């Protein structure tokens, strides 16, 4: 039986999602916990790999269950073996042709940016931080220029392994909640470091170093060296993949970020 899992995690202290030789990743922790419940090794595939320090409110992964277990075992049982900072929220049987990554038609990210002179204390590791005042309207105007299909090479990490830099951006927004700026992005897929590079560029525009039309120039030049530096991973949240309704997976729109930041 193929099983899909909904997972949330705090990326602080983990070396990203993807398993690596030295361990210390979210995937390593999840597979170890699944193995404890199953009694045999279990491998998982996820919807979107996250970097070190990046969080997730609704990561989705799937695996082929090697043994018969009730769904509660894949939630409560697995959670009892997971380290702090990682939790399975739900488990659901899916069709054999479901794939956490390839069945997704889009992905969503949110970036939380604390904008005040003092660095974060309570929110340390959970938000990005910028000390200089930012102009909301300028960043909102720049976001509009990101919508549609573009070559996002100017926002692509040098070691990005994506076959094509062309992606379709269906949502690019920024709003202000007190001294917190909330950036939301949804696209068919994202390049490595793409969201953090976009946020860094929007911050340059918000502080007045560049104008909103700088976005268009960067998209045209396709030169990563001309864009702003990559922003901190601390405030980045993978809010999950977007699937067609027929897969019957839970709605990811119930995470705490929606309730807090409206």
Swiss-Prot record:
Give one GO biological process term.
tRNA pseudouridine synthesis
Gene Ontology MF terms? RNA binding; tRNA pseudouridine(38-40) synthase activity
Q: Where is the active site?
A: 51
One Pfam family hit: PseudoU_synth_1
Quote the EC number: 5.4.99.12
Q: Which reaction does it catalyse?
A: uridine(38/39/40) in tRNA = pseudouridine(38/39/40) in tRNA
Q: Which UniProt keywords apply?
A: Isomerase, tRNA processing
Q: Which InterPro entries match?
A: PsdUridine_synth_cat_dom_sf, PsdUridine_synth_TruA, PsdUridine_synth_TruA_a/b_dom, PsdUridine_synth_TruA_C, TruA/RsuA/RluB/E/F_N
Q: Where does substrate bind?
A: 109
UniProt lists the family membership as follows:
Belongs to the tRNA pseudouridine synthase TruA family.
Its subunit composition reads: Homodimer.
Q: What does this protein do?
A: Formation of pseudouridine at positions 38, 39 and 40 in the anticodon stem and loop of transfer RNAs.
Name of the protein this chain belongs to: tRNA pseudouridine synthase A
Q: Which organism is it from?
A: Dechloromonas aromatica (strain RCB)
């Amino acid at each position: 039986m193929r099983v899909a899992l909904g997972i949330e995690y705090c990326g602080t202290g983990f070396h990203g999602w993807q398993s690596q030789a030295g361990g210390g990743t979210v995937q390593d922790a999840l597979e170890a916990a699944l193995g404890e419940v199953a009694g045999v090794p279990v491998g998982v595939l996820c919807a979107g790999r996250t970097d070190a320090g990046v969080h997730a409110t609704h990561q989705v992964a799937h695996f082929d269950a090697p043994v018969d277990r009730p769904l509660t075992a894949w939630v409560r049982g697995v959670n009892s073996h997971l380290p702090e900072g990682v939790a399975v929220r739900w488990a659901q049987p899916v069709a054999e042709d479901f794939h956490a990554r390839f069945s997704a038609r889009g992905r969503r990210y949110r970036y939380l940016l604390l904008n005040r002179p003092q660095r974060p204390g309570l929110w340390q590791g959970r938000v990005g931080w910028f000390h200089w005042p930012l102009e909301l309207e300028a960043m909102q105007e720049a976001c509009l220029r990101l919508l549609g299909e573009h070559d996002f090479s100017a926002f692509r990490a040098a070691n990005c392994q994506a076959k094509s830099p062309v992606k379709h951006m269906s949502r690019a927004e920024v709003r202000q909640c007190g001294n917190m700026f909330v950036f939301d992005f949804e696209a068919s897929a994202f390049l490595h470091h793409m969201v953090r590079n976009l946020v860094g560029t929007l911050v340059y525009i918000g502080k007045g170093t560049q104008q909103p039309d700088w976005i268009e120039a960067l998209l045209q030049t396709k030169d990563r060296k001309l864009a702003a530096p990559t922003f901190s991973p601390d405030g980045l949240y993978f809010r999950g993949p977007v699937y067609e309704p027929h897969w019957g997976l839970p709605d990811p729109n119930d995470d705490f970020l929606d309730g807090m930041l409206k």
